A protein has these predicted regions:
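Secretory targeting and sorting signals
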Residues: 2-34
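C-terminal His-loop and adjacent cap/lid subdomain of alpha/beta-hydrolase
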Residues: 35-777
Length: 777
């Protein structure tokens, strides 16, 4: 690894608006003879038992009395010493060992005074390593990614058709094979940043563009803003590495001199259901706030949740992609995650599951703690909206939209326009932000994936065999039931919707009983049917097909409520697996985190502000110490005008410099002065900062300065008595009589008729949220 002199960012970068299985988090097996003063071998690029692509970056540490010329290194008996070169200081050598065969390999190092060996287990660059069998069908999109047609990997009529090309490189109609795993040759090209602020292809003749911009890196050097971009495929997904490069660089002898030895892993968000290679994002690959300062940027379509939300596959992809980067460029001084929404989720999940193997620090934007626990309350949204819009439509309470928060917890507005109501004023976060997520994630019959590549993917009609649910996308995690559908942890047995509103007197006991008798639940995947209007536009000519709630896939009362609507039980295997797998953020994370978001509550945006504090609460639940996480909010009323991320990068660089210089002090004690809880106005100017600005959210202190400025809301489960953490899929139950004795209903003491009705609605009991959720160990 090249030497590096730490130079924290001195100035704030210019703003640019931007919108594992748990066991595998353990460290790598120790190399033989590692540690102390003996000769040892360290695997730098990955765990020794999780090597991919046939190569690994190794470091051999010499023992006293030995010199570099004394060293011999072999790979399964073949001499590979020439791959190793002395590091600064001369007491170790680093080399990229290639030619590893699939399975176990042995690398041995020998010098005059000692020897060591390490066993390396190699996996295909197409994966998988630990995520389970590959998903099929899997749509290849390499042409869209600028990589050309995928490589032929079978002649069995499975996957995307690959066509012969003519003398001009144009595709003919002749099929020469198929690609199931979507591999592609690696492509390197060069771009430049124009003085107008765009990235453009560098002229092929190497001439200097007249509008070539210059940029100043972290160490103060001003260089041409030229970017080298490498693209290829890893774990079946497309990846890119970008970093500054000199104008006229020889491709065969790449010059990393402008790299500041830091890496940004740029994670992207969105909601995808898999079965596709995804799409490369120009903004993600070419992240100007980082590239302009000399950071290298890693990006993969497999770490973009718009592609899929199986974060075991995502974590595996991140590890493999980081491994490839290290093999090519050496070990960075640190890797910081950047990315919003699902990109923020990935930072929390991968930081939890893999320690510092993917990222050493995190800057999650608009984050949630994870995706899967959002399904708990988002799965309630349309059930409650349907109740208020249809079942209880005559009730004037629900005509005032802000009253809907009594049941949904999430924010509501009497001002925000509603596209499902002729754009009249009045909506909820459930409607404005989450409508459409129910069919996308729960209905196996519906998908928004209409990519044209399906037309040339074989066997014909294979797309129609996919069960389009999040559960099935991650079936290797949740498991598969006897009916062939993935198991689901979603559950609302015993959930008393509107309990807090009942206790406060905002709804009557009669209304509470009516709601819980009629709200219902979701059908099983096997019983669901195709969606109606507006999700299937072809049927919108028939008013009877209008069904924005997906009510056709609900379990409702068969007789208007006399018989209580069925509730849905989460699958016990899925419940155990979702907790054990690492898909749930449990708070087990120790890396530095600057959690930043715009305050978007007034817009009913899905990135609601409570999530930052849910993350903190879970970290506190884990070990009582959340000092590694700081929370920043920037006001976005009336609109988002300032991006605080460049400042977060600057502060994080100072934080990492402290950890590098004083590792014995740990994360919290190395915080720079600005690594504290803060809130900002729309221009990015600080309103307040310090340890008490968010008081009153997770404690009973008077509201802090930022708490007062930026109020948060709840969820359907918190206003049903559930915990702030929001991580209970299936509650443990208590008898209705026990709940009454414990005062769960406040001043309401049900009479005999009401008690009988409660027991009809909840025959197995009601939620006891003083106990941990079912399936959690």
């Amino acid at each position: 690894m090249r030497g590096f002199s730490w130079r924290p960012i001195a100035t704030i970068m210019s703003a640019a608006v931007l919108c594992s299985l748990t066991l595998l988090a353990a460290g790598p097996p120790a190399a033989a003879a590692a540690g102390g003063k003996r000769l040892s071998i360290d695997v730098l690029s990955s765990r020794a038992d999780q090597v991919s692509g046939g190569d690994a970056l190794l470091r051999v540490r010499l023992q006293p009395g030995d010199a570099a010329r004394d060293l011999t290194v072999t790979r399964d008996g073949t001499d590979v010493t020439a791959a190793f070169h002395p590091d600064p200081g001369g007491r170790s050598l680093t080399g990229r060992v290639t030619g590893l065969r699939l399975g176990w390999n042995t690398v041995r190092a020998r010098a005059r005074h000692g020897a060591a060996s390490v066993r390396l287990r190699d996996f295909p660059i197409s994966g998988p390593i630990f995520s389970g069998p590959h998903q099929q069908p899997f749509l290849c999109t390499t042409e869209r990614g600028g990589l050309g047609q995928p490589l032929v990997d079978n002649h069995d009529g499975q996957g995307l058709r690959v066509f012969a090309v003519d003398a001009n490189g144009a595709k003919t109609g002749q099929v020469i094979g198929w690609s199931r795993d979507c591999g592609a040759s690696t492509v390197v090209d060069y771009l430049y940043r124009s003085t107008g602020g765009q990235f453009k292809p560098l002229p092929a003749d190497g001439s200097r563009p007249a509008d070539l911009a210059r940029t100043t890196t972290l160490d103060g050097r001003t260089v041409d803003y030229v970017v080298r971009r490498e693209r290829g495929t890893i774990n079946r997904f497309m990846y890119s590495f970008t970093m500054l490069a000199p104008l006229g660089e020889d491709r065969a002898h790449q010059n990393d001199g402008a790299w500041n030895r830091r890496v940004i892993y740029h994670f992207d968000g969105g909601v995808g259901i898999g079965h596709t290679q995804g799409s490369l994002s120009g903004d993600g690959m070419l992240y100007d706030p980082g590239l302009s300062k000399g950071y290298a940027v890693i990006y993969s379509t497999g770490t973009r949740t718009d592609t899929h939300y199986n974060l075991i596959v995502g974590g595996e992809t991140a590890l493999m992609t980081k491994e490839r980067f290290i093999e090519e460029h050496g070990v960075p001084d640190y890797t910081v995650g950047v990315g919003g929404s699902g990109g923020g989720i990935q930072q929390y999940i991968y930081g939890q599951n893999y320690g510092t193997r993917v990222i050493d620090a995190a800057i999650p934007q608009y984050s949630y703690p994870d995706m899967v626990t959002q399904t708990i309350h988002v799965g309630d949204c349309e059930l409650l909206e349907h109740y208020m819009d249809v079942t209880d439509a005559a009730n004037p309470t629900w005509k005032k939209w802000t009253n809907r928060s009594l049941l949904e917890g999430l924010n509501a507005s009497d001002i925000v326009s509603n596209p499902y109501n002729g754009n009249k004023p009045g909506s909820t976060e459930c409607v404005t932000a989450w409508r459409g997520l129910t069919p996308l994630t729960l209905d196996p019959n519906w998908t928004s994936n209409n990519d044209p590549e399906w037309q040339i993917t074989d066997p014909p009609g294979v797309k129609d065999t996919v069960k389009w649910t999040h559960w099935d996308d991650a079936r290797n995690v949740y498991g598969v039931g006897p009916d062939g559908y993935a198991r689901s942890p979603w559950d609302n047995i015993g959930v008393q919707y509107g309990l807090t509103a009942l206790r406060s007197g905002a709804i009557t006991p009669a209304g509470f009983l009516d709601l819980n008798a009629k709200v219902g639940s979701w059908k099983s995947s096997a019983d669901m049917v195709q969606e109606g209007c507006p999700f299937v536009p072809q049927v919108c000519g028939d008013p009877a097909q209008y069904d924005p709630w997906s009510a056709r896939n609900m379990q409702l009362s068969p007789d208007g409520g006399t018989t209580p609507a069925p509730r849905k039980a989460g699958d016990p295997i899925a419940l155990r697996n979702v907790y054990d797998s690492g898909l749930v953020f449990s708070g087990r994370i120790d890396i530095p985190i600057i959690d930043w978001r715009h305050y978007l509550e007034d817009q009913l945006n899905m990135h609601n502000t409570r999530q930052s504090f849910v993350e903190r609460r879970r970290i506190l639940d884990h070990d009582g110490d959340a000092s590694n996480q700081v929370i920043w909010f920037t006001d976005a009323r009336p609109s988002a005008q300032f991006d605080q991320t460049p400042q977060a990068l600057a502060v994080m660089d100072q934080w990492m410099a402290g950890i590098h210089a004083r590792p014995n002090l740990g994360v919290a004690a190395n915080k720079p002065p600005l690594a504290v809880d803060r809130c900002f106005d729309t221009q990015g100017d600080q309103i307040a900062a310090g340890p008490h600005v968010w008081d009153g959210i997770l404690d009973h202190r008077p509201a802090g300065a930022c708490t007062q400025r930026f109020p948060i809301h709840g969820t359907s489960r918190t206003v049903a008595g559930g915990p702030f953490e929001g991580d209970v899929f299936k509650c443990r139950l208590q008898p209705v009589s026990a709940a009454i004795d414990r005062g769960l209903y406040g001043s309401w003491r049900p009479d005999a008729g009401q008690l009988k009705r409660l027991k009809q609605i909840f025959p197995t009991g009601v939620c006891d949220y003083t106990e941990p959720g079912v399936g959690r160990r």
